Swiss-Prot record:
Monomer. This is GTPase Obg. PROSITE patterns: G_OBG, GTP1_OBG, OBG. One of its GO terms (molecular function) is GTP binding. Residues 1-159 form the Obg domain. One of its GO terms (cellular component) is cytoplasm. An essential GTPase which binds GTP, GDP and possibly (p)ppGpp with moderate affinity, with high nucleotide exchange rates and a fairly low GTP hydrolysis rate. Plays a role in control of the cell cycle, stress response, ribosome biogenesis and in those bacteria that undergo differentiation, in morphogenesis control. Its cofactor is Mg(2+). Its main location: cytoplasm.
Length: 338
């Protein structure tokens, strides 16, 4: 399924049904009193989250949603039927924004969360309502009111406990694929990942965490260069970021430069992202010998100064993956984030 994280839709609530003017007409009662019923209320438009969606692609093809109008009132004081509501399903993590005012109506982060986005029109009154001691045969009835109309902007921000980031071809997708159920594409060329992918990492039959893989970042990503910039927002809800680094490069100075490229892009894009816990994951240790690893790591750590956590792994050989999964789980568990 194609990934789409922005959409604009039009929602139209149903109009209220008009009241009716009518009079009782039965055998032997040719001139009965008023018996016009009220109309029915218009249907409402709701948005509700579901777990089986992770894209807004459906709204690329269907953009207008209209609830049913209320029925007009009937004679014999019968009320018109209320218009049926409609419930539009959206992925968890969708922000609902009024397109005209930029007001955030709701940030939908819970399963089965339901929010009213367009209220149906109020019913009109039948002429029975206007009977009085001074007006025995009222002919007046009122019309139902129009339902609300709104233009909504939907913005999906995926929900994951952990997010991965790094340069293209650093091994992010291989890591995510080998520790979770994610079916990410893997190949030895840059920009293999073209859209965010979520994977579930199972700890046991009850406990798990969700990890997000976004396209690789390059210098200038925060200003729109490359593929990853448009997906950086999907890291905003993550509690922990894993910075995946290719340690197999010949010149360790290039490694240092690449690390700072990613950190600078985070800071430029969003200080919230830059201030999140970031663990450094040095990947591709299978491509160099232990002496080179230790020499490079020592030089890198000296240049970086204090860092929160670091790991040495080979994502493709699955070396060190159990350790990092355990550390992530402990981190999330200790902070009551699971």
């Amino acid at each position: 399924m194609k990934f789409l994280d922005k959409a604009i839709i039009h929602v139209i609530a149903g109009n209220g049904g008009h009241g009716r003017t009518s009079f009782r007409r039965e055998k032997y009662i040719p001139k009965g009193g008023p018996d016009g019923g009220d109309g029915g209320n218009g249907g409402n438009v709701w948005l509700q989250t579901v777990t089986n969606l992770n894209t807004l692609i459906d709204f690329k093809f269907t953009k207008i949603f209209k609830a049913q109008d209320g029925q007009q009132g009937f004679n014999k004081k019968k009320t018109g039927k209320k218009g049926s509501d409609i419930v539009i399903q959206i992925p968890i993590g969708t922000k609902i924004i009024d397109h005209n005012t930029n007001e955030i109506i709701e940030d939908m982060i819970q399963d089965k969360q339901l929010v009213l986005v367009a209220k149906g029109g109020w019913h009109g009154l039948g002429n029975t309502r206007f009977k009085s001691s001074t007006n025995r045969i009222p002919i007046k009835h009122t019309k139902g009111t129009q339902g609300e109309f709104r233009i909504l902007r939907l913005e999906l921000i995926l929900i994951a406990h952990v997010g991965t980031l790094g340069l293209p071809n650093s091994g992010k997708s291989t890591l995510v694929r080998n520790i979770s159920n994610a079916k990410t594409k893997i190949a030895n060329y840059p920009f293999t990942t073209l859209k965010p992918v979520l994977g579930t990492v199972k700890i046991n039959h009850k406990e798990f965490f969700v990890i997000a893989d976004i396209p690789g970042l390059i210098q200038g990503a925060s200003h729109g260069i490359g593929l990853g910039y448009q997906f950086l927002k999907h890291l905003e809800r993550c509690h922990l970021l894993l910075h995946i680094i290719d340690i197999s490069q010949i010149n360790f100075k290039n490694t240092i430069t690449n690390i700072h490229v990613i950190l600078d892009e985070l800071k430029t894009y969003n200080k919230i992202l830059h201030n999140k816990p970031i663990w450094f994951v040095f990947n591709k240790i299978d491509l160099i010998d232990d002496i080179d690893i230790n020499t490079k790591l020592k030089s890198i750590l000296e240049k970086l100064g204090s860092i929160q956590q670091y790991f040495l792994i080979s994502a493709i050989k699955k070396t060190g993956l159990k350790k990092i999964v355990k550390k992530i789980y402990d981190f999330l568990k200790n902070k009551n984030l699971l």
